From Swiss-Prot:
A Pfam family annotated for this UniProt entry: ATP-synt_ab_N
Cited HAMAP family: ATP_synth_B_arch (MF_00310)
Protein name: V-type ATP synthase beta chain
GO biological process: proton motive force-driven plasma membrane ATP synthesis
The keyword Acyltransferase is assigned to this record: no
Signal peptide positions (record): none
Protein source organism: Streptococcus sanguinis (strain SK36)
């Protein structure tokens, strides 16, 4: 049993950090309880121990703390989350406390929010298709169960609408196993929080979801704990309750800003653009908690969403995220300004595991071929449009004009499906064939003839 030690030796409080002197037997990540002179209590966590001094990060802010009268208790255990299957359908704050007016959770157990390291040998390869209902993802950048696939957005782009759409529509095809969504929002405004909660309530998606909401006016230090708390809940549902769990985390940029704020308070030597030098390592402790385990039915799939400052994909946050994750979905400001929703730019987007989750028995036999042909045709159509801007449309061949027509319809009908349309993978594939029928059959060089005979709409082919 852990021994609780109490001290009244607080020597300094700087921002979200507290220094406690003359401590003994204190450990890194240990949970700390602070009792103020008015009897109120706050929580913190040991961030660093040097000789007889402990640095504590405070989850609820440092205002109102009297150095002489504050009592600090070291509990001897890490920060833990009470977990239960009853968490599904509930809404929590950033520290895992219910905020939906419902009863407290009766925990089956308490789990360390930092989780357990997963042995690479124990990992199972991701290979099962997850349908999001969004053609640009399902067909062209397929999401696979156990994958981590981030969304790179920008300020003012509709990533919150995209996140809500995925939370509503995502499902594992051809599976009778339970599916759950863990939705974690960090540093969002009250209006954004209301949007997410109302959207999931109105559509009924709340019944299979767990929400963790950290508001912009909550302490920055809480923002660092929020994704770890959410991932702990996801791992519990996946590995102990055999559920397929999709974790949507928005906005990771707010998380990294909080990390930079705490690093500055600790007076650490800054790295690129003021972020701590351990930003990559810290992000990996979140992203690497996705995956499947050998012998376990459940899985954890991640969609981290981040807004790129100044739309700069070389910024440290998207740059380091791209190194750790398995692809990226990129939102385009140009498509957004043209009125396309969701404005997914499919050409620079990538899912590195898309070939593992597609094909006969998973989606359909023509998935990979049509995906490659759509990419090639869209790229060629974009080039033709750029050429027409420079030289005029008269410089285009008849085939080039067909590619331009294909590109326009691809953006208007395929990408621009709206935030309320839920397309099955079959509907996305059929729409792809309909668009490809605009082009001459001789241009469909990435698809086998027997597949063209089977799927290409005959009426369109006869018209040409």
């Amino acid at each position: 049993m852990s021994v609780i030690k109490e001290y009244r030796t607080v020597s300094e409080v700087v921002g979200p950090l507290m220094i406690v002197d003359q401590v003994a037997g204190v450990h890194f990540n240990e949970l700390v309880e602070i009792q103020l002179h008015d009897g109120s209590k706050r929580q913190g966590q040991v961030l660093e121990v040097q000789e007889d001094k402990a640095m504590v990060q405070l989850f609820e802010g440092s205002s109102g703390i009297n150095l002489e009268k504050a009592k600090v208790r070291f509990t001897g255990r890490p920060l833990e989350l009470p977990v239960s299957e009853d968490m599904v359908g509930r809404i929590f704050n950033g520290m895992g406390k219910p905020i939906d007016g419902g009863p407290a959770i009766l925990p089956e157990k308490y789990l360390d929010i930092d989780g357990q390291a997963i042995n690479p040998v124990a990992r199972d390869y991701p290979d099962e298709f997850i349908q999001t209902g969004i053609s640009a993802i399902d067909h062209l950048n397929t999401l696979v169960r156990g994958q981590k696939l981030p969304v790179f957005s920008g300020s003012g782009l509709p990533h919150k609408e995209l996140a809500a759409q995925i939370a509503r529509q995502a499902t594992v095809l051809n599976s009778d196993e339970n599916f759950a969504v863990v939705f974690v929002a960090m540093g969002i405004t009250f209006e954004e929080a209301e949007f997410f909660m109302n959207d999931l309530r109105e559509t009924g998606a709340i019944d299979r979801s767990v929400l963790f909401i950290n508001l912009a006016n909550d302490p920055a230090i809480e923002r660092i704990a929020t994704p770890r708390i959410a991932l702990t809940a996801a791992e519990y549902l996946a590995y102990e309750k055999d559920m397929h769990v999709l974790v949507i985390m928005t906005d990771m940029t707010n998380y990294c800003e909080a990390l930079r704020e705490v690093s500055a308070a600790r007076r650490e030597v800054p790295g690129r653009r003021g972020y701590p030098g351990y930003l990559y390592t810290n992000l990996s402790t979140l992203y690497e908690r996705a995956g499947r385990l050998v012998g376990k039915k459940g899985s954890v799939t991640q969609i981290p969403i981040l807004s790129m400052p100044e739309d700069d994909i070389t910024h440290p946050i998207p740059d380091l995220t791209g190194y750790i994750t398995e692809g990226q979905i990129i939102l385009s400001r140009e498509l957004y300004n043209s009125g396309y929703r969701p404005p997914i730019n499919v050409l620079p987007s990538l899912s590195r595991l898309k070939d593992k989750g597609s094909g006969e028995g998973k989606t359909r036999g023509d998935h990979a071929a049509t995906m490659n042909q759509l990419f090639a045709a869209y790229a060629q159509g974009k080039q033709a449009k750029e050429l027409a801007v420079v030289l005029g449309e008269s410089a285009l061949s008849e085939t080039d004009k067909l590619y331009v027509r294909f590109t326009d319809r691809f953006e208007q009908e395929y990408i621009n499906q709206g935030f309320q349309t839920n397309r099955t993978i079959e509907e996305s594939l059929d729409l792809g064939w309909e668009l490809l029928s605009i082009l001459p059959r001789t241009e469909l060089k990435r698809i086998k003839d027997d597949m063209i005979d089977q799927y290409l709409p005959q009426t369109k082919e006869e018209e040409r």
